[in-house]
Every structure is written in C-alpha cells, then in structure tokens.
Amino acid sequence: MENEEPVLSAPDVQVVDPDVRAHVYSLVTALGGFNGEDADKYVLGDDALACLRDIKRWLKLYDEKHNRMDVARCLGEANLVNGDLLPILAVWANSKKQTKYMSRIALACLELLVPLTWPVELHGELTINHHRHIPYIQHVHVSYKRGLLSHASTSYLRTIIRVGIPSMAIPRSERTTRDEGILKLLLYLLRNIALITPNTRLAAEGDEEETSRSATINAFQDQDVFALLLTMCSNVGDDFTMQDVALLEILFHLIRGVSVEKLFMDDAQRTAKRTDELDDLLRQESSLRREYAKNAPTRHGRFGTMIWVKRDDAKYSTVSGQNVLKDGQATLQKMDETKKWNKPLIRRKPQDLTVHNDFSTPVHLNSTASNNLRMFVEEFLDSGFNPLLTHVRKAIEREADRVMDINTRQFLYTTAWFLEAERARRARQRKKHAESEKPAKELEPDSFGLVAGVLNQETFVFLNRAMQYALDNKDWEDLNAGMRCFTQILLTVQDMAQSPLEEDQEIAENIQNRIFYEETTHDRVLAVIRGYKDQPFGYLDACTELTHVFLRMLERYSKENLDMQVRSRRRARRKAKDVEGTGNDENDEENGSEDEDRLEAERVSKERKFDFRRFAAKFCNQKCVDTFVAFTKHYKELNTEQLKRAHRYFYRIAFKQELSVLLFRLDIINLFYRMIKGPGALDSSKPIFKEWEEFVRQIIRRLTKRLDQRPALFVELLFSKINATTFYLEYGHERQTVTRARKAPAELEIDPRQAHTIEEKISIMVPALVLDGEEDLVTWVSDVLESAVEEREAWETQEKALRDAGAENSKIPNPMISVKARDDACQQAMFSNAKLRLLMTLVKFERLGAEDVPGAAWIIPSAPRAQDLREMKSFIDKYFEKAKRGTLGRDPRELIRRKYGGGKTASDNQHNPDIQFGDDSEGEDEVPDGPLFPPNPRAAPNPANKPTKKKKRKERNPDDEDEDDSVDEETLEERRRARLENSRARLAKIKSDLYVHASDEDTDEEGDKEFFLLEEQRRREQAKRIKHALLTGMTEDGDGSTNKKGQRKRQTTRNRTGEAKSKRQRRGKQADEVDEDDDVVMGNMDAPSPMSDREGTPSGEEDDGFNFDDDLVFSRDREKLLGSAGNEEKDSNRPDKAMAQDEDDDDAPIVAANRRRMRAGFVVDSDSE
C-alpha cells in the first residue's frame, strides 16, 4: 500500500502517521473476515461491536477534532466498507433469526457508513492535509457507492432501510432521541449515495456507468428507496418533522441537471431528440472543418513565403504564407490573425466551489432510469409535494437549527424543477389524449391544487426576500435558483389562467394581482438584467428567461386590466431640525442621536397607475442590450426557444420601442451578420432562422439609412450609446421637453373648534414650525413685522402731524409694505411651505396677483395699523420662546389640517363628481374630504303664515368710535366658520333617508312574503284581462264611460304610460352603463323622493296591470306618507299635472346602485359601507 502512495517532496515523506495507520489496521483486522474453510461466508470477530465503536471513536476524536483525513484514508486503504461493513450487513439480512446483538452491529455499520461517505466540499480553509487526501477520498467514495448500489446477492439499500423501519413504526410522540437519530442516519446515507459522482479530474476506470445517476435511480426504484421517500414526504409535518431538510437534499441531488422535457418523452420521442442532437453536433463539426480547410496548409506549399508590409506610419511588418500574395485584403487579414490579445485577468472574490450543488450541468439518463424517475416524480407530485415543501419553507423562515445556508438554494431549485415537471406532465396528458384514436371520453380538467403549496402569499414573500438578499450579497448561484423558481411560478400561473376551471382562473388572476402589484418586483427584475457582468452561462440563461417571461406576462396582464395599479415604495427623508450647541456634551450626544434617527430613511408606499410602455422603456438601455448580446454570442449552442427569446427582445428594442440605435454598434452588427452569413452561421433549416434573417436585414437597412441621414453615427458605431445622445441619434433632433410649473402646496387651516382668535391660532402655528425645525422662518416673519411696525408708525405720525396742522389733504394714502425674503431658501419656503404660508396669512400678509407661482410677491396691505402689527409680533415672539423651552402640551401639528375646497355647489357635485385616479406622475394622490351624502331636505324655518320677530339691534356707544371695526368682523367670521365646520361634521355622519331605506335589510321575511303575494295577485288579474280581451276583442275599461272626456282621459293615460315606459327604459340603460364601469362611484346626487313614481303615475286598474316595475318592496314605508300626500295624489290624476310631473322626472338625476369599488382587481371597501 505504502509503495503506491505518491511522492510529494521527498522519498521519505509519510502521508499518514505510522502509529495511526497501525491502530486503524489492527481494528479492521480484529473486526472479522472471510473464513478459510468457507470463503463466501464472513465471520465476525470475538468483539466486533467494540471494534466498530472504536473505529467510530477514531473518526470522531482524531479526524474531526484535529481537522484531518488520516483515519478516513486508512479505512479506505483497508477496504473497510466493501470488505467488512457490507458483508456484515449481508450476514444480518440473510440470517433467519434476528438477534438484538446483530441488530446493534447493523446499526453500528450504518453509523460508520454515514461519515465514510460524507461528501467532501472544497473551500478556502482547506489545509495541506486536506489537499493531500481529497483526491484519494473522492476516488474511494465512488467505490463505496458502487458497492452499495450493486445487489447481486444482497440488496444493501433495502437492508439499510430495515435498520430504520422499527424507528419509523413508532408514533412521533413516542419516539426517543435515539429513534430520531437512526432516521437521520438513514436519510443522510441515502443523501450521500445520491450525491457521490465520479471526479472528472481523476483518471476514468471505465465503469462510471455503475455509479452514474441512472444506476442510482434504478437502484432506488428496485430496492424500495423511492417508496420510503414517498411515505416520509407525504407524512411530513404529521409523523416526520425533523427529516424534512434531509428529504429535500435527497430530492435535489436526484433531479439536479435532469432535463424535464426529455424526462416526459416516450422512447420514440427521446430517440428522435437524441438523433437530432447528434445530427447538430455532426453538422457543427463539419462546419468547423470547412472553416479550417479555407486557411489550412496544402501539400503544394513546400516553399515558404515571407513578405514585408509597409503600413501607414512608415513601419514594416512581416507576414508569412503564400496566401498573402493574393491581394492586399488577404494580407491585412493574415496580419489580424497573427495578433494575440492578452485578455486582462478579472479579480474575483474567492468563492467556495460548490461542486455537489451545481444544477446547471446537464445530466443524461437512460431509458429505464427516465421511466423510473418519471413515475416517482408523478407520485411525488400527487402526494408529497405540498407537505414537504411547505414544511421546509417554514423551517427556513424560522431559521431552524437543522437548516443550512445551502438549503435555500436547494429549496428554490427543487420547487422550480417540480413546477416545470407538473406543467410537462399536463402537456403530455393533453397530447396523449389528442393523439388517441378512440378517446373514450373528454379529458377531465385537473386542478392545480397539487402544487398550491408554493403558490401562496407566504411563498412569494419568502421568494422575494431570498432573491433580494442574494442580489445584495452577490450570491449568484442562490439568485440563479431564485430566478428559476420565479420563472416557473409565472409560467404555472399562466397555465392556470388558461385552465378550463373557473376556480383556477380566479386564483391565477389573484396571484398575478399580487405579483405585479409590487413595484419592488419590477425593479428587482430590472436590476438583475442590468447587473449582469461575467457570471456563468446558467445564470445568464436564467436572467434572460425571467426577463422574457415577466415582460410578456406583464404586457398581457396590463392590456387586460387597463386600470392596473402598482404600489411604489420610495425612500423619504424627514428633515432634521438644527441642533444648536447650547447644552453640555451629553445633551449634544443625545441630540446627535436624535438627528441620526430623523435622518434614517423611511419606506413610504403609494399607489399609482401602471404604464407598461414606460416600464418597458427601462429595459431599453445599453446594459440590458449587452446582457442579451452576451447571451446571443452562444447562438451555436442555443436551442430554438432560447434563440426566440433573444430575437423577441431585440425586436422589442428596435421596432416596438423605436430605439434601434442601441443596436448600432460594430460588435453587435458583426454578431448579427455572422449569425446569418457566417462564418459559423445558424443552421438555415431551423425554423427560427427565417425570423432572425428578416430581423438582421431590417436592422442593417435601418443602419444604412441612419448613416446617410446622420454621418455622426459613424463615430458612434464604435461606442455604447448614452442616454444623452440616444434620442438625437434615433430621431435626428433633441427631445422636446415641456417644463411643468410646480404646483402650490395644499392650503391648510387650523381646526376652528380648537382656536378662535388670532392669538390662539398663532400659538398653534409658531410651535408647529419650530417642531418642524423651521425656527429661522419664524424669526424671519418676526423681523418682517418689526420693520413693518416701524414703517407704519412713521406713516401714522406723519398723518397725525398733517391733520394737526390743518392741511387740506391731511389723509395721505397708506402705502403697502413689501415682504422681502431673506435668501433663496426663504423665497422657496414662501411658496412650498404650507405652514409658513398659513402663518403669513394669519399675520395679514397677502400675495399679489391671482397666480400662485414660485417667486410671487407678498405684501402687508394698508389696512392693519401699527398697533395690530406690533401685537401680532408680540404673539409670535411669546410663543416662539415657549416652543424653544419645550413647554408645550399637545402636539400643535395635530390641530392643523387641509382646508376644505370652497365654491362648489350641489349641481357641480352632481355633474362633476370629484374622483381622482392615481397616475405615473409624482405628487399627492389625496381625495378631498366631504360629506358622503347631500343634506336632508329641511322644512322652511319661517313659514309664510307665521310672523317673524325682528331682533333688536344693540345701540352702539358713540364713545367707542375709536375702536376698530375689523376686530368684530374677524370675530364674526370666525364664528361663521365654526358653525360651518360643525355643520360639515354633522353632515358627515348623516346617511340620508333618500339613500338608505328600511328595505335594505336582506332578512325581512314579512316584506318578502307581502311582495310575492302582491305579485301573484297581479299575475292572476293580468291573465283574466288577457283572456277577456281574446274572447271579446275589447279591453276592460276601469270606469266604462263613453263620453269624450273619458276618451281623452284614457288616451292621455295611454300616452303617459308609454312615456313612463320609455323613461324607465332610458333609466335602465343608464344604470347598465354605470354598472359596466367598475371605477366610477357616483356621489352627491340629489335623488327623487320615494313618492315620485307614484305621484307621476295615475292610479287605476289599467296601470296596476301594466306597471310591473313599481317598487313594491318599499310599500310599507310609503304608506306612512300617503296620508300627508293625499291631496297631491288626487291632483296628480289630472292629465296636465301628470305630464308636468313626468317632465320633472326627466330632470331628476338617476341614482345608480352603490357598487364596490375595485382597483386593479382589489376591492376597496369604504369605511361607511
């Protein structure tokens, strides 16, 4: 053995410590062996169980403790597994009498098999000892797997399962820690067997097929491993809770790299597929040979040729070969071929090599293994998919101890693979049913409930969090698995939307609402495609597929839902107040921490209308184009679906978004040209070739046209396009942008119930500005008032002097005082700070002009006297000092609110309901408050027959002439506004009887009974009248009179009935039109009184027979009103009164039934409903 060890540095180098080797070999020898008399029978040693435990102790205390692999190598050299452990298991399995001692030995063998087959991962913390032993350990693992899978005499896997069956049979509540450990060992051994693969860097021994994936799958099927996995997976959460992660790992290593498309093919389709693949490889090989033959040396080129080429810079270059004598172009081509590009090395962050978790490398299965795996996959989808993956997701979310970082990647890939398998199985079933000659019955649609465990909101949240974490930490393999999972979820939802079951269609609609509603999902897809740099091809394939599927489904969904809304989350920062260093160091530290808290970014959410064209334009940039160009460069290895994916993206860029200039770069044009014309062109027999050929022809045609129009594009062909010049290069002129004037902030007001006088309002506004950190603005307002007081006092003094001198024009005009901003920031705050504007309004500042635009001039009018201005300044200074001392009770900002919009009448509300929808533009999407219903009609407060008492006006004292009238005016104005506010608050609580009736109770059984009795009576009377008309040829008359007045009355009644009928038809049509629009909510409409229909319709037997649309449900409520309206009802029987009332009905608005508002598929319930 020692002579076979490689010599590393010197002949006397010892790979393993001789003492360790001697101890391990002695234990293996004492374990037992084959008897000389019966060479086929293994005989255990006298103390075999103790030997097995000692070997386990050596592995644990030497290798694991010292981070070495010496004992594992010695056991591999001693052939412990194939020479001792497996024969011992065979003896235990074939013995007729099962003893407790042999069961312990079998369990000890299982305890050794797990660490001996444990996979070896390469990472950055490997030592020299590891690098010395890892190749040998990997080689020995393959031999262990070969011995476990071979079952010429004994099915070792079935025997190992027998070791764990007693623990499985015990109920979960009665299992001990030992039972759980046995099940864990059993599953870990199966995981190791599925994971072990031959090392491609080691020399092949010719028997790799015995340890291939196909052999593993066939052995699992033959030795009942699949049955064990199905049993445990279907009972995860009930009988097995701690085994979910191990089961997930087994499934992952069984299916990783397996093509779902080939798995669900039958033998004929699989053979045809492999034939096509072989034909493609042969065609590529012949193409390479033809390209090589063009420049290959010939048998006649025996004499060498060397020439000098004089270049433009007077330098000479040497070129050899006879083919350079053809022409100058061939010479330059030869020079280019001799150039060598030293590609710079890319410094990457060292990452661990996850050899055993690579799912991008394809794995080929034979026919038997494909059939066995397909049967297992179908049974797993039917019984174990939902329980296992739901339980694993919950374990990963709560970060259970048994969960490793790699399990998230395995979960996402396994979910994606089985979702694709479910879609492939359904497609296969539909195809087989369509191809069957005699379909017995129509194929019953199957629900997607089998995979519903990964289509819920919890899974979407977990997937989004995992993808964002992988993107932030640049963990590309985890992000690759997340993108595959997200893509398969989208494709599964797409199939659900096309399902014949209405339940699946509704679920698919709801899932799409949830996915596309979050703008963070849109941004993440965009960041992934734009952030590609030099990741492996599997990552490139996943991100391009996700972009293709996401854009296609989002475009279709946005077309079907025109009022689609998305929730955007932006980062908003609250302005921190300036902290003045007036305190000690501790206070400074506290204030500094408060400022940091205020400066922390907050996520604010807002709904806005979605515009797909605007979103698709975000993918029209050079980074996204470079990603798809890097993907298209592998066009020789791409299949038809992948080529179609790249073609659709470039077509969207060039023709849908009209940004073909992004493709006008030399390397991109050269790539397109080589794909069609060669060398190494696409196979012209492929169906996608025609589409690519037409696309490249149109692109080159546009390029030549643009070059003729804009010669500057010749230079731009060498570089990537930037946003500043893209529009000009595409359209020949700069983008015409229209600057939109900034909108003034919403006008604020102070709650009239909390403040009535100017001082009370200033006591609210000044602390509010101080709390917002705007002390400088308060100081500025105080300074402006101070200067205004001085100027106004000077004018008043001058006016008094002129009046005392007895001048004729003693009253000179009081000049207005201009309000000047201190700096640009103050000027900006005068327009954008709503609280400052309210304070300025309170202290009698006024804005000049009707337009409220930035930079508008503010003045102090001539009405306020110096005394008034001084008083307001004193109020500001007083409450400014209180606010700085912090002696405030309630937060004054809570007393400030948006001001109600005035000037709107009821008619305006009727014809122009104030409805606002979200838009892509930034701004505040706030719906102004207002009463839900118009006020109830009130009786006249002063009837005409009741005399009113005149109020005695208080006589004014002539001594109070000097008192200013403006104060009384302000007090009255404040009281009027307080009354208006109380009225609005009262109206907001009113639900008018015009809209809410007693019949709104759905459980009124007496009303329903009365309604149906009246309907039955009307039908009987109608049947009698029809029968009488058929027998006699005449209709019944209510009164039987034949005079002209009665004829005119009946004629008028018929006309009125026809008009009423047509009126009802028009009303019904309008109501239907309103019902068709889900987004329009009609409010503030004056409805006709409940008596309007009866008042406009004459009473009589004829009308009782034909007016079927009378609202009989409300009859009980209306009977109360019949007594008071009896005179009016008598008058309404006259033709002129009836016609007049019909005309009034035409003008009355129609109140549509209140519908639940929906936005992008979500029901928005009002609080009052």
From Swiss-Prot:
Primary residence: nucleus
Annotated Pro residues bias: 931-940
Listed name of the protein: Topoisomerase 1-associated factor 1
Localization terms from the record: Nucleus
GO biological process: DNA repair; DNA replication checkpoint signaling; meiotic cell cycle; replication fork arrest
Family to which the UniProt record says this protein belongs: Belongs to the timeless family.
MF terms in GO: DNA binding
Residue segments, region Disordered: 573-600, 900-1150
The keyword RNA-binding appears for this protein: no
GO cellular component, one term: replication fork protection complex
Basic and acidic residues bias spans: 973-1000, 1009-1024, 1113-1140
Organism: Aspergillus niger (strain ATCC MYA-4892 / CBS 513.88 / FGSC A1513)
Top-level division of the source organism's lineage: Eukaryota
Keyword set, alphabetical order: Cell cycle, DNA damage, DNA repair, DNA replication inhibitor, Meiosis, Nucleus
Bias (Acidic residues) ranges: 583-599, 917-928, 958-972, 1100-1112
Nucleotide-binding listed as a keyword: no
Function noted in UniProt: Involved in chromosome segregation during meiosis and DNA damage repair.
